[in-house]
């Protein structure tokens, strides 16, 4: 999870909310008597909102930072809109969470879609290995886990190349005034150490290690090797996408990575 800098609210979302302030996000499958239009009735409206979220997030899952793939040949996108505060949990006087732009994120499918693109890497047969919004469900975790919109620019995580495991960098976390226990709950509640995600992170770490090894063999110092790799990979591509598992690369390349990063992240 990294900081997300939100862009301007999509036009169709703003127009719909202004005209239908109490509208539901989607039709309740149990309620066949629903009267009125829901947000998801219009595919163009949903797609515009999802695309703006993908742009804002550099096409990374708001929780695990895996890249968001679009499906081809009938496969499902590994991408969907998530409500940080459950859209169904609205108390008297609260905003309509379903249509609140500040409450919307875009995430991967968390491993629970068998027809997702690249299922061999992105689908899990064991529900205990699901992650991100799947485990979060309708739980109100606003005061329990971090909201990526409120994170600092600093990387508060550390990773282990031998396993791909994510842990809390307590020193950085405390220096940023963040609650270490809340950071650990974030990992736990979103199951960010799902074996599926750990394998993907380990692959990124192994690739970085191989790149560094090649440069060391060519005579470069470790600092120069890390700096040149950071300049090459720690940036958005032409489509505006960050590299998958951005924080993993940032951590592994250390101080040399920080010198290559351009704000905002």
For the regions a protein language model found, what residue spans apply to each?
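C-terminal, charged low-complexity interaction regions
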Residues: 167-265
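Short, well-ordered loop/turn elements at secondary-structure boundaries
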Residues: 55-58, 100-102, 151-154, 160-161
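Histidine-centered nuclease catalytic patch
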Residues: 66-130
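Long, low-complexity, intrinsically disordered segments enriched in glycines and aromatic residues
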Residues: 121-179, 185-190
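A structural signal for short, well-ordered beta-strand segments and their strand-loop junctions
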Residues: 62-63, 80, 106-107, 156-159, ...
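Short, charged surface segments at domain edges that flank catalytic/cofactor-binding sites
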Residues: 6-63, 90-91, 95-99
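Active-site cores of enzymes that catalyze phosphoryl transfer or operate on phosphate-rich substrates
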Residues: 2
């Amino acid at each position: 999870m990294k900081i997300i800098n939100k862009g301007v609210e999509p036009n169709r979302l703003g127009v719909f909310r202004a005209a239908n302030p109490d509208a539901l996000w989607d039709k309740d499958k149990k309620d066949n008597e629903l009267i009125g239009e829901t947000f998801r009735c219009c595919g163009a409206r949903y797609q515009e909102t999802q695309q703006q979220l993908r742009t804002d997030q550099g096409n990374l899952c708001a929780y695990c930072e895996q890249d968001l793939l679009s499906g081809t040949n009938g496969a499902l996108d590994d991408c969907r809109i998530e409500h940080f505060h459950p859209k169904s949990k609205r108390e008297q006087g609260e905003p309509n969470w379903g249509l609140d732009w500040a409450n919307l994120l875009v995430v991967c499918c968390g491993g629970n879609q068998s027809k997702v693109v690249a299922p061999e890497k992105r689908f899990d047969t064991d529900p205990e290995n699901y992650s991100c919004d799947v485990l979060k469900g309708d739980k109100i975790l606003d005061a329990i886990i971090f909201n990526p919109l409120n994170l600092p620019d600093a990387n508060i995580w550390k990773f282990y190349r031998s396993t791909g495991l994510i842990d809390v960098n307590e020193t950085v976390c405390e220096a940023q005034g963040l609650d270490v226990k809340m950071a650990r709950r974030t990992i736990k509640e979103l199951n960010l150490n799902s074996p599926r995600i750990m394998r993907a992170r380990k692959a990124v770490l192994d690739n970085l290690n191989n790149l560094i090894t090649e440069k060391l063999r060519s005579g470069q110092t470790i600092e120069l090797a890390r700096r040149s790799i950071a300049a090459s990979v720690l940036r958005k591509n032409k489509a505006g996408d960050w590299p998958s598992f951005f924080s993993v690369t940032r951590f592994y390349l250390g101080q040399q990575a920080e010198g290559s990063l351009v704000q905002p992240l």
